[in-house]
Amino acid sequence: MRSSDCGAVLAWSVKMHRWPVWASCIAYSILSLLRTSPIQTTSGDWAIAFCTPMIRVHGDMRRINLPEMSAEEVGNMVTSVMNDHQRKIYQQNLEVDFSFELPNVARFRVNAFNTGRGPAAVFRTIPSTVLSLEELKAPSIFQKIAESPRGMVLVTGPTGSGKSTTLAAMINYINETQPAHILTIEDPIEFVHQSKKSLINQRELHQHTLSFANALSSALREDPDVILVGEMRDPETIGLALTAAETGHLVFGTLHTTGAAKTVDRIVDVFPAGEKEMVRSMLSESLTAVISQNLLKTHDGNGRVASHEILIANPAVRNLIRENKITQINSVLQTGQASGMQTMDQSLQSLVRQGLIAPEAARRRAQNSESMSF
């Protein structure tokens, strides 16, 4: 079968922690494929694509030598790892997001979908061990943020920027240091936490609850100290998350925004005009921090590291949000390093000085490359 005749593409995107050594024989079974691929690897994102086999290494696509597959073969492989409920959603919606675990191998987050060539899927491995904030080389202010008794902490960035990994590390820090009740609401569950000093309950959309809003509404009666909302997708979920933060809970959430000011705007903009002033007031009182991040290839090419824009909601920031002067937040970021704040450009400069990324990589991602000095 020629590559151009291929009826489907199966892609596998994984986050790993040491270079893998591929087994010489990979069968036409997704379980065999995943089991024959060691997960003990260096930090990076990998992807495998069939019909035109490729693998993504730290953001770069590379071809690999794997057999081509028909649309029927790909479809059978994809549905073989679904349960009945996931298979039903896939058949009805033509796409589904879920996770599953191969014992003694890894957990995988899967997005199955359909294309003009037929069924397709993307698999991403979820490390069995949650990395610590130190292992992620996260700024020390992250620990202080995680120690907040209440408020809203938003981790934002584009898809694949490591938001889930950062949140998992912060939840793990709380779990290791505080006697707290931590409740997570995810779609799907990615990192599996074991209770340590804290009690952790993890709920998955469509498995343990019908919606984020339902789970958040119930959470207020489940006596949590910390609530993780996997995605803040709609006004109802965002409103309930703000209420939870206002009523004394520490709420973690994610948004696909780039930058603190854009994050504040996004939250306010999802509400009708008549509610925006009230939402700004709630956000000004409940916001603790906004962490916006991106991943960059390390200087040695053997991994990736995150750069962060960090906004701490001090009185000046709260006042700007309340008075709808969001554009002035960037000025506060530039002068707020004493309290742990930093702009993305300041973070990039720091990573260059630490020898973690190349100056050229920093300049490509900088908002104002001309002002950067190393």
From Swiss-Prot:
Subcellular localization(s) per the UniProt record: Cytoplasm
SMART domains with a match to the protein in the record: AAA
Cellular component terms per the entry's GO annotation: cytoplasm
Pfam families recorded: T2SSE
Ranges that cross the membrane: none
Listed GO MF terms: ATP binding; ATP hydrolysis activity
Residues where ATP binds: G157, P158, T159, G160, S161, G162, K163, S164
Keywords linked to the UniProt accession: ATP-binding, Cytoplasm, Fimbrium biogenesis, Nucleotide-binding, Transport
Protein family: Belongs to the GSP E family.
Protein name: Twitching motility protein
Organism of derivation: Neisseria gonorrhoeae
Higher taxonomy: Bacteria, Pseudomonadati, Pseudomonadota, Betaproteobacteria, Neisseriales
